[in-house]
Each structure stands twice: as structure tokens, then as C-alpha cells.
Amino acid sequence: MNGEWKRLIDKKDKTIWKVKKTHPEYVNIIRSIILRELPSLSFDQNDKMDIVAHRLVLTKEQIAKHIESLPIHYPPTNDEFKIVLDVVNNTQIEQFLTTDDCMFTLNGKKVDPKYKVPYNIEPMPLYKNQQIKIVAIAVKGKPKDNAKFKCGDSSFEANDDQNVFDFWIESHRKYQTPNDMLKQAREILKDMCEEWYKSIIKELKDEDLLEITLPVNKNMNQFANLVRYRILEDPNVKKEIINCKCNNINVMKSTIDIYIQRRENSKTNFKQIVRKVLDGIK
């Protein structure tokens, strides 16, 4: 199910693979997980930021947005990751602030923020006799909740050959390579399979059913399409199936329905079918 992945270009921050023996439904959900589900750290301008500013042109809200936009090149953690910016401009000229003016700490201990070159906190000039002091604590989140947590990009293109794709991942965070992101996306997909299986296990108890409707959270429509495709194409189960389709999303419902119909003389019940399909995806 995972296909054959061969690296065409392999850089620290971007990798391109030639992917064979899989299907667009699979590479598409891997792409979606990378764009939506991979967690990272970001500063929060709400209850995690304390700003003491004197004689500044910018408002505190504007300052908070500039700090919030700083990329954090440190793995997501539940420990306290903090930035402190405390500067007084005693010169006669305006001073533009960078990450070199900041101190980064993890649980109170100074850490390297891993910026190759100082990252400009722009536009945030500090004029003569102006002072700024900011203390901000990072929070962990996912891109699907807020774009500031996005830690990379990913996409794919189909080749002329059937089910052959050029798939690429670009990392925006220095603590992880594209290959790390691919591995993490696959682990998240495994978790999605198991969480969904647990949510529908009660629906699968009746071994005599010849048709069944299984709900999937409507935010997981790509997952639903992947399951539908595998049910129809998996050689271990497709001979047992007459029909399988995803019903259109009803805006009044919170789920997508996967409708499955199996053959009357089938020796495999729905519980076995779904289990085989999910194991094939992983």
C-alpha cells in the first residue's frame, strides 16, 4: 500500500521522491497530514505574551504579531520554551531588532535558536531613547488550527505512467528533515486508522450483515476516500465486495458515510474486511 519511494533529489530542507505502486488517494492523504497535522511550536499573542514597551511607534498588538511570526526551530515540547527581548536604544540612530537581540530558554536554560543568520523582527524599529521588553512563551499546535504552526510544504504530480508520482516535501523547521516529516506523517496515518477502527467497532459486531454504513468525521474526507478505494482494490477483500461508496457530505451532519455491501456467499464479515483494509493502509 505504501508503494515504492525512490529519492530523486535529497537536500536537508527539500526532498523529491519518485513514488510507484500506490494510488493518488494514499499520496494525497500523506500530503494532507504534512500540511495539517504535524505539530510545532509558535508564540501566542494572547495569554502567553507579556509586553512592556516605552515610547514605541507600534502598538502592543502590532508588536505581538511580529513576535508571533518568528519561526521556532525547536521540536514541539510540553516544556517551557521562552523568548525574552529586552532592549534600550541608547544610540543616536534607529535600531532594527533581530533574533540576536533575543534570549531563548528551555525550562529556564539558555538554548540555541538555530537561526543560521539573525532573523529580522521587522518592521520593528527602535528609535533613540526607546525601550522594548517582551517575554513570550511558546505553545504547541497544528496547522489545521492556525497557519502559524505550519512546519513545511508538500505536493505531488502524476506522471504519464499510471499510479506513478513525483512527491516532494520541504521543511521549514531546522530540527526535522523531509524524511522525518514523511515518517511522522505515516505514523499519524496509522493512529488515524486505529482511532477510526475503535470508533466503529460496535458497528461491526453483527457478523451476518450484508450491508453496512460506517461514519467518518467529515474533516477526514480524504481518509474516507482512501478507505473506500482500498476496500474496492485490496486483493484480500475486493472479491468479497459488491459495492462501496462515500455518500456526499451533509452540511447538517458531522460525518461522511462509507456504504459497503458484501456478497451474500462471502466468507469474510465486515469486521475482518475493515481490519484487513486498515492493516494494508499502514
Predicted features along the sequence, with ranges:
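Protein-protein interaction/assembly regions in multi-subunit complexes
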Residues: 1-282
